[in-house]
Amino acid sequence: MKKLTIGLIGNPNSGKTTLFNQLTGARQRVGNWAGVTVERKEGQFATTDHQVTLVDLPGTYSLTTISSQTSLDEQIACHYILSGDADLLINVVDASNLERNLYLTLQLLELGIPCIVALNMLDIAEKQQVRIDVDALSTRLGCPVVPLVSTRGRGIEALKLAIDRHNANDNVELVHYAQPLLREAGFLADAMAQEMPLQQRRWLGLQMLEGDIYSRAYAGEAAQNLDTSLARLKDEMDDPALHIADARYQCIAAICDVVSNTLTAEPSRFTRAVDKIILNRFLGLPIFLFVMYLMFLLAINIGGALQPLFDAGSVAIFIHGIQWIGYTLHFPDWLTIFLAQGLGGGINTVLPLVPQIGMMYLFLSFLEDSGYMARAAFVMDRLMQALGLPGKSFVPLIVGFGCNVPSVMGARTLDAPRERLMTIMMAPFMSCGARLAIFAVFAAAFFGQNGALAVFSLYVLGIVMAVLTGLMLKHTIMRGEASPFVMELPVYHVPHIKSLIIQTWQRLKGFVLRAGKVIIIVSIFLSAFNSFSLSGKIVDNINDSALASVSRVITPVFKPIGVHEDNWQATVGLFTGAMAKEVVVGTLNTLYTAENIQDEAFNPADFHLGDELLGAVDDTWQSLKDTFSLSVLANPIEASKGDGEMATGAMGVMDQKFGSAAAAYSYLIFVLLYVPCISVMGAIARESSRGWMSFSILWGLNIAYSLATLFYQVTSFSQHPTYSLICILAVIVFNVVVLSLLRRARSRVDIELLATRKSVTSCCSGTAGNCH
């Protein structure tokens, strides 16, 4: 079979991702475009004659970029297409928005690269009574047009057949440009490198006349002739860019008049009716908060019901199983305990997180594919405008509920450097999936029936602190107004199950692999430090270990937030959590259960792997029945109650160490708000600078320590009023000083704002191949 590389390109919300998932299934690889942190997805699939590598290009409305302050999407798409890596392009077109989508189609066809138009979302078009003559559209465009409903898999085989058959587009003159434009485009094309096809050189000439700033990178000496061409055109037409766009739109209008009835089509009545409620100025925000609460409720309840299978199952295999092997093969006791506690305990920490994290990713994917996430940005627009940000900036913040890294990277879709930087500074406060793993454990141990409510309050607190951070920046070092907010609202539709599963699987796999490697390594590292004293001797009691001795010295720093000296394990969790937040659970699990593992005698004769696995399945089945019982459906928060049988395990030890729910909640506040994990720090440094990364870390530490101290000291004020009053006043005075210093620093910061993406804007300024 011949190998073929295909670029998949289309407007946002055209169903491109769904088609990508339909074609490639789970055979996907996710990376970054060279030099930038924009995600690059590749997948594999086969047709009758070809083994295809499919490259998913960023969603974009056109290939023209007129400002360096815009997003990188157009730049990356343009560079990849001109690089020559793609043998064929598949342009995904939304049939229900044909006229707008055809602008990008015309730009692609003008390049002369073999192209297939995938006419997607025909089911939505039919509901809106839009009729399209596919054969007539194919004739007018000069390339194959394949009708699709990607959510149902309709038309996939026809698309594969078109891939095998299509080698070149028909020689059709699509757009009739004014003669002066063609003359100057030809003049610029003649000055370019002759090894580039003439059609592409003329296209680049038109792009330069239109004001595209990145086409000049390919023009070579022709870029020096641009001013001459524009000067000649000035005598013949007012605005060359306007004439170019007008010619394309006239072509699109002529095509649509012949092939469709879009002028008489009806908009979706269902979408319009639902939007009257969802986008209501009074109901929109409460509905958004309810949707977020529902997500946490389902993640904790249903995910929690599935947890025994992963928890007890991993204990049976990776802890008791390792102990059985160690005793059977006569390993030294210290080695058996080390392997069971370090390696086995690390795996046992990761796997029980899978159900709840997986449920959250599934819910987020559903919201994204259904069309609700775009509405959430509009709902939050008024609030974001108060911060001097457009509502569009809330979209990457919502992504932060899954992971803060793509949230930080998503800020590059914003236009102004100030808006990008403010969004980056706010992103780490959005509670990610790794933090949910921590919250779920503490909710079960301390908050009983109010567990889901406690978790929801932490998520809301994260949003509030992100907003307050934005307000602080607006009134101190980043004053300014928001740019206008224009965003397309896709119609509502039921997400495709296969696409949901693939998206959830990709996210969950990334989380498990990333978290697993770190947690297992940290667990082994902690087990080693927990087994020896500072003098290097093996200890019988972990309280005499090197880890305990060092941690006790540091723990008094956290006394104001409710971490007492004997709870040194919690201090270790905060430090390891800086590597990855999910490691906090692994650290606490390893340290709180260390004594139990040392003290418990393991009898190999009593170990029966099959019985323990059957017990895990039985517990899971019982949990599922309880979760979906009538009593729980009537009172869903009941399903998140803590398990009293865990009193002798890690949760029981944790309960004793913290002493109260107030101390535990204060600890969670600190975990929510303090330093982001290493991967997020790296993303912040790449998207802005190391200086802004340092600012984000210091600001997060201050907010976390201040808020956790205020909460704990207020709730425990009656126990030590004098100490609490001193702590509260110290926090207030310190923050007043910090805000005063930030206001004075404004004049020095403003100059540096435009430089925050200096390395990014220049990353693709060379040859086309540099961006792939």
Swiss-Prot record:
Function: Probable transporter of a GTP-driven Fe(2+) uptake system.
Transmembrane segments: 282-302, 309-329, 344-366, 383-403, 427-447, 453-473, 518-538, 664-684, 691-711, 722-742
UniProt xrefs under InterPro entries: Fe2_transport_prot-B, Fe2_transport_prot_B_C, FeoB_Cyto, FeoB_GTPase, G_FEOB_dom, Gate_dom, P-loop_NTPase, Small_GTP-bd
Binding of GTP 3, residues: 56-59
Gene Ontology CC terms, in alphabetical order: plasma membrane
Cysteines paired by S-S bonds: none
Record organism: Salmonella paratyphi A (strain ATCC 9150 / SARB42)
Family of this protein: Belongs to the TRAFAC class TrmE-Era-EngA-EngB-Septin-like GTPase superfamily. FeoB GTPase (TC 9.A.8) family.
Induction summary: Iron uptake is repressed by the global regulator Fur.
Residue positions binding GTP 1: 10-17
Keywords carried by this UniProt record: Cell inner membrane, Cell membrane, GTP-binding, Ion transport, Iron, Iron transport, Membrane, Nucleotide-binding, Transmembrane, Transmembrane helix, Transport
CDD domains hit by this protein: FeoB
Stored Pfam families: FeoB_C, FeoB_Cyto, FeoB_N, Gate
Gene Ontology MF term list: ferrous iron transmembrane transporter activity; GTP binding
Membrane topology: Multi-pass membrane protein
Recorded superkingdom: Bacteria
Residues that, per the record, bind GTP 2: 35-39
Binding site for GTP: 120-123, 149-151
Name of the protein described by the UniProt record: Fe(2+) transporter FeoB
Localisation: Cell inner membrane
Domain FeoB-type G span(s) in chain numbering: 3-169
